Amino acid sequence: MIEEAEKYLGMPYVWGGSSPSTSFDCSGFVCWVINNCGNGWSVGRTTANGLRGKCSYISPADAQPGDLIFFEKTYNTTGASHVGIYVGDGMMIHCGDPISYTSINSNYWKSHFLGFGRIN
């Protein structure tokens, strides 16, 4: 999954984007990676909160590379408002602007942390 995600490093954030031809928003990026990583998963195209509903809760201590990481209140919506792919060692790959590796231990991400999830 991480190998698929790395193909898109540096691509810009585009609201509503869901494929390499349009670029991505956060959930479009994660959905594309899940659907195209070769693990046989299919989540369609959904929101960060929709992806959260397709996952089992994982404690931070049990999070593994490839699990999803969810954040809330990154903009005015209820539930999960941002999603990334946990890569281990306190890092995620996500569609910020651009798609990049980011520490989940910054004050910003720690203040918005909602939880980890593993695709069912």
Which residues does each predicted region cover?
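Flexible domain-boundary/linker segments
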Residues: 22, 95, 101, 107-109
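Short hydrophobic/aromatic patches on the structural cores and recognition surfaces of FHA
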Residues: 29-30, 84, 116
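Catalytic cysteine-centered active-site loop
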Residues: 11-65, 111
